[in-house]
Amino acid sequence: MNMNSVNETTYPVLSAITGRWSPYRFLDQPVGNHELCCCLEAARWASSSYNDQPWFWVVAKKEEQQRFEVMVRCLLEPNRRWAATAGVLLLSVMRTSLKHNHQPNPVALHDLGQASAHLALQASELGLQVHQMGGINRSFTRHTLAIPEGFEPCTISAIGYPDLGDPQTQEDREYASRQAASRRRKDLVSCVFGGSWGETAEAVTKTV
C-alpha cells in the first residue's frame, strides 16, 4: 500500500477506515505522548457491556529502551524483527470477569476488540498506523509483566509512522512487498445473513 492508496470500499465509510492498514516497516520517528494519548483516549470511549470497560494496556515506547526490549521479547518470531522498528509497542489486556458481580464476562474479548479498533482508527486519522499481533508468548508475557490472575494478555500492537521509502535489505524488501500487496475483504453477501444462517439478507443485495 502506498501513501496515496486507500482501501476500496463498496459503500462510503469514514476516511480513517479507508486509510487504515497494517505496516511491516516503520520510520525511525518517535510517537509523541500527545498522539499516543489521543489514540488511547479514543479506545477508552468504546462502548462495553454494562459499561464494564474490561480493557487495559501496557505501553512501551522505543525511547524507553529497557521496557521496549522486554515488550519485544513478549512477541513470537518473526514478529520481533519488524515490530521492533515501531515507535510504540502496546500490550492489550482483558479482564475476564464483570466488576459488578464477579461473574465471567462472555463479551470481554468483543469489548476489548472494539476499543482496539477505536485506537487503530484514531491512529489512522493522525497519520499513524497500527499493526495488531496475536503472535505473542502469553505465559512469558504474564510472568514478565506481572499480569495478575483474572486478566488475560491478548495482543501487542506496533504503533508508528509507516516507512514507505525504498527498502535497503532483502528482508526489508520482503516487508515492503507485503505492504504493497493488494488488500481484499469478503463481500457483505458472504457474511451478512437475513432471518437465519446462510439466508441471503435483502438489505445487502438491494441498494435503496
What is the meaning of each model-derived region?
Residues 1-208:
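Acidic, surface-exposed loops and disordered segments
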